Amino acid sequence: TEYKDFPLPRLVFGFSVSADNLITDVQLGVTETGRLTPKSKMFIYPFSNVEEFRLCTGSNVLPSIKSLHQLNGLPYFILKMPNNYDYYKEERTKLNLDYRGLLEHLKDKDSQYYYDNVLIDMEKTLNDFITEVSK
């Protein structure tokens, strides 16, 4: 099922790029709202295909890039990739729904709904996310 205009919490992305301009790793996280600082709170990613901060792209092939500014369009590309149940666990949200149930429940909510009713504190900070990306 394709969900058009699906609401999302605030996401941050990290990319590892090889010397030959291949994207070798993608990190994805959920931050708190407001001004971001190294101490900004991170939340458990509520959907599938992410473990800790690491995105599993499965058989999806990430594009090669010619310059770093091309990374700007990569979040859209990633969010359009097909999802499955890989790495999905019901206990990653306060709602404890199966994946299809979660998507159906969230499809008409706004982004703030995540912070009030869905997200669980990861007990990590944005600085932890940046450190993971830098490894």
Residue ranges and their predicted role:
Residues 91-135:
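Charge-rich (especially acidic), low-complexity segments
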